[in-house]
Amino acid sequence: MIKNNLLLFLLVFFAGCGFSSPNIVIILADDLGWNDVSYHGSEIETPNIDKLISSGVELDRFYVQPTCSPTRAELMTGKSALRLGITRPISKNQRLGLGLEEKILPEYLKELNYSNYLLGKWHLGSYTPEYFPTRRGFDYFYGYLSGGIGYWDHVHGGGHDWQRNEVGLREDGYATQLIKNDTLRIINEHDFTYPIFLNINFGAPHIPNEAPEESVLKYSYIQDETRRLHAAMVHEMDNAIGEIFVALEDKNELENTIVVFASDNGGLTPDVKLNPSFLAIPKIIGICNTENRFGISLFQWVCENYSGGSSNKPLPEGKMSVSEGGIRVPAAIWWPGKLEYSKSQNFISMMDVLPTILDLINYENQLNVDGESRVNSLSDVTNPETSKYVVTNIINDKYAVIDMPYKLITSNEGDQLFNILNDQSESTNIAEENQAIVSELKNILSQWQFGENKSLPISEVLKDPDLFGGEEDRIPWVEKAFKNSETNLTPNNGGDLKWVLLFGIVIILFISVWIYRK
């Protein structure tokens, strides 16, 4: 009843004011930690994100997958990443991306005459052009296809990765600012007779830790250098969000715009636990403290992933983990005059965003999705809707099942059950005395839909790691995709297998020295 009344009100409102369908802006941060925003008490100042939170619906129990591609797949489809077979980041040499048979958000919006723009990160497949966003409902794409680039050089894994509409683009500038500038241009030039969908996927604050000097100096009071750089990257993103809001206001469109903000997963913290565990060896034996790391890209990749400057406190762990710090993220939905400020403790996951948005704009066709519309939760934050959600870690050896207020983490190490409403730090395992609940949650897991896993084996990824920034040793990725479509789909390898073998030798030597010292 509440939902029907809200939708009726919105329809009458638009009819009376002569407005078109509302604009939609989805802003995704990349690896933004729970304690990386000032409204959670962080030392990092985020006034524009805070303003969005304080005047919209703060989604305090917003859950995602613990890595980027799985979360982005859920956003685009409304389906579980496990059902889609996307359970870890899509590697640059991975032939399969988000299934081409899947209908994604811009394709739904096309039916309602939206103009669809994607700016920033895609990361849902790029091995051949058929996976490009411009082949999947987006009218325009400016940014990069892979999981991360150098902020200044726009390089990923040895290849340049920056384009506009399937054409490689070489331009100077800091990636966050370039994404912002192009977004402002689009807003200023758009004919708002037709509604616009802006999917703005910032790379910040994903590694590498790079930021303009003036932003770094702003945080000179932060002693730790990595944290200081991380803060500057968040600052750049927050400034960009503020300017985008001003541009919409200048066009008199801010009141007619739905904004969704979230991070794709928890922050990458300095104490991250890489899997497989042997990847910790370069850090243990001090390679990560050397300048050149012997010129080995595998060592560089490992050490980069130990250079995270995020904080998820008081939530445990972070990116790649199924603990709260990896999957519970800052988030809000904002629509002035229609959604009043509130702090919602109701559960919502990334796969609920698509059906919720389509419900808000009165999309009437049948949906084949796993997520649910949360319009009731947005209009009545005291309405305790329930939902079941399953996540997995980066090597798929640990699963978490959420059915509020309980969360079960199951692995070969045993079962852990937490009441996450009362124990967000996950410090008290209550599995032993609640075996009936454990059984119920295991039953949810057993009935969950799992699709064929599209991920490359970890061993294949390590042969040619996905580095972020650095020297170019191959053709740009957009060019490689077109070549792949014409040839035998050979990987764009930089010939790093010899270094994998050397890495194995180092492991053997390390173990030998350890045994000798014992």
Residue ranges with predicted function:
Residues C17-S411, D415, Q424-N443, F450, ...:
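Formylglycine-dependent sulfatase
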Residues F14-G18, S512-I515:
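Hydrophobic membrane-targeting alpha-helices
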Residues L462-D464:
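Polyampholytic, low-complexity intrinsically disordered segments
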Residues I505-K518:
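Alpha-helical transmembrane segments
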Residues L11-V12, V500, I508:
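Small-residue packing motifs within transmembrane alpha-helices
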Residues N5-A15:
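Sec-dependent N-terminal signal peptides
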Residues M1-N5, I515-K518:
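Positively charged n-region of N-terminal signal peptides that target proteins for export
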